[in-house]
């Protein structure tokens, strides 16, 4: 025995006897597992004495070390750090250098192996490879801890030679699979895949019987299947299916085939805040928004509308699944160490390559500074090793925002179209495995992003220098479209690096057109001044946006069907004609006429290519947020106030009984409700509500009392729903769903941007509350949403007005030029805005007092 071994033996003995003390002094709660009779057998050192006396604090499980993991959602018992493992690790290197061959295994003869253990061990060996100097793993690690009283003479090194312990922490950090967890997963997968066809068919029928809003009830939904499998399922043009995005939790991917090429479109899930305590889910697809995925599919299949402008792909033939979702997940997304060829395997090892359906692992919760601390996956120390931290980070997917795609379109930063080649970078292991894993088309994908703990995304400058970067996946191979938002690969990689395409290549030519629209005007003007006309404009020169200085409303040259060339303000015959036209149709028809005129004025509809070139943007909703869109903002302010005044004149001009005025009030309330709910026109909804809330109308007590008596439902609708909703809109707390909006509520934003030109109409919502700064910030934040979804408003307006046959007379009544001529005459319509509004406020006050004179205090 060497001198070092003697010192180690003395330290070991001192720890055994001095650290634990006398066994008789132990409390009864720490009594030995065996009776005191077993202590008399100290001289017997047979290797098959498994029932040895062991201390409760260092006891390890009997069978293979099946430590529970938080990702498996099993019990967390037994995951505490073992103090004996640290000691065993220090002497393991010395033992391997001294001994050339392994000692006999200390396996108790009376404990049988659990079923399927050999198969699980074979899978583990295939995944990790054999170790040359380490003996085979024994299924009984409990022989490591031997009672210190029974073997005081045996050196520590000899005991550890006979039963080499496993360093649980090191092999978990290195990404090696555990035998126990593989055994559990193998059994679970085998149980699912070995189900009888009758059982699978019955389970599929139960899924298809669910509610139609439940995605599982539709056969074209295939769950978590790999990208390659989905491409093989769509065989003909028009075939399509919906699957889960394997990297963006909660998102979906529409896979279809068009022009003999498989295309993938990502469906983003966003949370829309509709109030302080109410939120709902929206699914954004291209420039459209839907309440649920089945509505998206019904819309595109029923209308045969192309899913994207770039590809022109049309879907009409669903590819139905023939197995339940549980079976598909077991086939492609559950097995870690399974020997089935379809089981996905991570390139960086089986550990951490799969994610449970409703949970995320600790890697997804890392912040950027934690991820960039280390270079390699196995040797990373940025992650805390105790499993308690993993338990705390295994949160529900519904409780955290998506880390891979923005949850709101407001936070999206558009990718530069000038970079069309996307290089996907995956973290690779620091050392190659002893046994090479077979390449599989499914092994590249997995249900969890392939960023192992501590892998660091390299910067653009050093990304290509590393020896372990994986092959690049260009965007052009995934789809022919240059649109990054529509054709980004939803299933591979954690981060991407944009590489500029080579000038003259096909990718460069395809992206030049879209890049001109995305770049700022300053960059394009600078390029024009330095290099002349850009080559990517296909022979066209850059057109500077036109800064409009004159209003689009010109009452003097307005050609009318109802108004003569020269008219006076508030002509009685003209007012009677307008009242008759408004009474002939119902509130919904009026709302459609109003919405059509609004969308034409705001340039949501009827925008030609020439108009887009002159504006510099595609839609008016984006123009009104820009500096050169000032005239559009002023025109919308003019239209808002003119519309409110005309409706107020229509009510106050009713000189009949209070019942007639109450009926007219009721129809006006119905018009506001139709504009809000059916048409999604928040602009005219606010204008109609502004007319009802005018002081000259709200003071008509007899009219409102009659309304509550004769039209109770209208009065309740106005007081309980419409007024609170408008208040929430003005305070920036609530808004309609994007899928139902044709004209957003932009009046507060316009008032903020044009505060010097906006006519005073009472206190602003941000000036009469203590939360004024929050209200202003909410409206400025909403401006980003308005500018971003201009195409969505255009699509919604087209859908709601599809097949609508408008009457020219009603369209003229709701046009701004007609209203200006009606209210101020042919000459007064050209006067200044402030003067017109000031005079007409006095006219409305006079009409109101004529209907219901003010009660004098002496008459009370």
Swiss-Prot record:
The modification Phosphoserine is found at residues 22, 359, 440. Residues 162-175 have a biased composition (Basic and acidic residues). GO terms for biological process: JNK cascade; small GTPase-mediated signal transduction. This is SH2 domain-containing protein 3C. It comes from Homo sapiens (Human). Its main location: cytoplasm. The C-terminal Cdc25-homology/Ras-GEF domain adopts a closed conformation rendering it incapable of carrying out canonical exchange factor function, this closed conformation is required for interaction with BCAR1. Keywords: Cell membrane, Cell projection, Cytoplasm, Membrane, Phosphoprotein, SH2 domain. The gene is SH2D3C. It is a peripheral membrane protein. The lineage of its organism: Eukaryota, Metazoa, Chordata, Craniata, Vertebrata.
């Amino acid at each position: 025995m060497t001198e070092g071994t003697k010192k180690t033996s003395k330290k070991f003995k001192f720890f055994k006897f001095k650290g634990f003390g006398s066994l008789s002094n132990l409390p009864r709660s720490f009594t030995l597992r065996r009776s005191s009779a077993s202590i008399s057998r100290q001289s017997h050192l047979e290797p098959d004495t498994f029932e040895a006396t062991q201390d409760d604090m260092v006891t390890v499980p009997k069978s293979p070390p099946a430590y529970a993991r938080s990702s498996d959602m099993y019990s967390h018992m037994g995951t505490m750090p073992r103090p004996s493992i640290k000691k065993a690790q220090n002497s393991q290197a010395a033992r391997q250098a001294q001994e050339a061959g392994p000692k006999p295994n200390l396996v108790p003869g009376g404990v049988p192996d659990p079923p399927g253990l050999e198969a699980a061990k074979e899978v583990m060996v295939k995944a990790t490879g054999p170790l040359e100097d380490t003996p085979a793993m024994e299924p009984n690690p409990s022989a490591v801890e031997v009672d210190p009283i029974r073997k005081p003479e045996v050196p520590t090194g000899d005991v550890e030679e006979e039963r080499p312990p496993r360093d649980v922490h090191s092999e978990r950090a290195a990404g090696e699979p555990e035998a126990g967890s593989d055994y559990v997963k193998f059994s679970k997968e085998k149980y699912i895949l070995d189900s009888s066809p009758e059982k699978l068919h019955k389970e599929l029928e139960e899924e298809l019987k669910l509610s139609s809003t439940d995605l599982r009830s539709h056969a074209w939904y295939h769950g978590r299947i790999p990208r390659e499998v989905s491409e093989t399922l769509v065989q003909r043009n028009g075939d399509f299916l919906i699957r889960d995005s394997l990297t963006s939790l909660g998102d979906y991917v529409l896979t279809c085939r068009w022009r003999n090429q498989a295309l993938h479109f990502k469906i983003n899930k966003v949370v829309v805040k509709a109030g302080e305590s109410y939120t709902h889910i929206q699914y954004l697809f291209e420039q459209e928004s839907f309440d649920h995925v089945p509505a998206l599919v019904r819309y595109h299949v029923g209308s045969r509308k192309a899913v994207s402008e770039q590809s022109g792909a049309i879907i009409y033939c669903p590819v139905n699944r023939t197995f339940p979702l549980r079976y598909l997940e077991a086939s492609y997304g559950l097995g870690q160490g399974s020997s089935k060829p379809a089981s996905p395997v991570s390139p960086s090892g089986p550990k951490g390559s799969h994610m449970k359906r409703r949970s995320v692992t600790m890697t997804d919760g890392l912040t950027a500074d934690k991820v960039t601390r280390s270079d390699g996956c196995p040797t990373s120390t940025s992650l805390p090793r105790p499993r308690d931290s993993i338990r705390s980070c295994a949160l529900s997917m519904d409780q955290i925002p998506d880390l891979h795609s923005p949850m709101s379109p407001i936070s999206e930063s558009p990718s530069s179209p000038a970079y069309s080649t996307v290089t996907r970078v995956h973290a690779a292991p620091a050392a190659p495995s002893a046994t090479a894993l077979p390449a599989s088309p499914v092994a590249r994908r997995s249900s969890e992003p392939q960023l192992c703990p501590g892998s660091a995304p390299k910067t653009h400058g050093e990304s290509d220098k590393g020896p372990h970067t994986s092959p690049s996946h260009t965007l052009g191979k995934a789809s022919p479209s240059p649109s990054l938002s529509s054709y980004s690969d939803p299933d591979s990689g954690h981060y991407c690096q944009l590489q500029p395409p080579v000038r003259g290549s096909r990718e460069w030519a395809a992206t030049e057109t879209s890049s001109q629209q995305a770049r700022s005007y300053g960059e394009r003007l600078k390029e024009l001044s330095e290099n002349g006309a850009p080559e990517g404009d296909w022979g066209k020169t850059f057109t500077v946006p036109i800064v409009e200085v004159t209003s689009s409303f010109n009452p003097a040259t307005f050609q009318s069907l109802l108004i003569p060339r020269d008219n006076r303000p508030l002509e009685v015959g003209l007012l009677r004609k307008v009242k008759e036209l408004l009474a002939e149709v119902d509130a919904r028809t009026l709302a459609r006429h109003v919405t059509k005129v609004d969308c034409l004025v705001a340039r949501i509809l009827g925008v030609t290519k020439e108009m887009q070139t002159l504006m510099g943007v595609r839609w008016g909703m984006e123009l009104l947020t820009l500096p050169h869109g000032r005239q559009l903002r002023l025109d919308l302010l003019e239209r808002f106030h003119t519309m409110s005044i005309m409706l107020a004149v229509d009510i106050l001009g009713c000189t009949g009984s209070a019942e007639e005025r109450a009926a007219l009030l009721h129809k006006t309330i119905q018009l506001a409700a139709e504009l809000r709910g059916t048409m999604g026109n928040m602009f005219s909804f606010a204008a109609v509500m502004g007319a009802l809330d005018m002081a000259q109308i709200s003071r008509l007590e007899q009219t409102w009392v009659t309304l509550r008596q004769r039209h109770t439902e209208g009065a309740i609708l106005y007081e309980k729903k419409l007024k609170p909703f408008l208040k929430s809109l003005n305070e920036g707390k609530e808004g309609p769903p994007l899928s139902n909006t044709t004209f957003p509520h932009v009046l507060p934003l316009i008032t903020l941007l044009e505060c010097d030109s906006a006519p005073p109409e009472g206190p602003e919502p941000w000036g009469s509350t203590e939360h004024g700064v929050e209200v202003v910030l909410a409206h400025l934040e909403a401006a980003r949403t308005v500018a971003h979804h201009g195409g969505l408003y255009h699509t919604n307006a087209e859908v709601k007005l599809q097949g609508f046959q408008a009457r020219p007379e009603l369209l003229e009544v709701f046009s701004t030029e007609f209203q200006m001529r009606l209210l101020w005459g042919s000459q007064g319509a050209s006067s200044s805005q402030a003067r017109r509004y000031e005079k007409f406020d006095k006219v409305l006050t006079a009409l109101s007092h004529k209907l219901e004179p003010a009660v004098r205090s002496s008459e009370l």
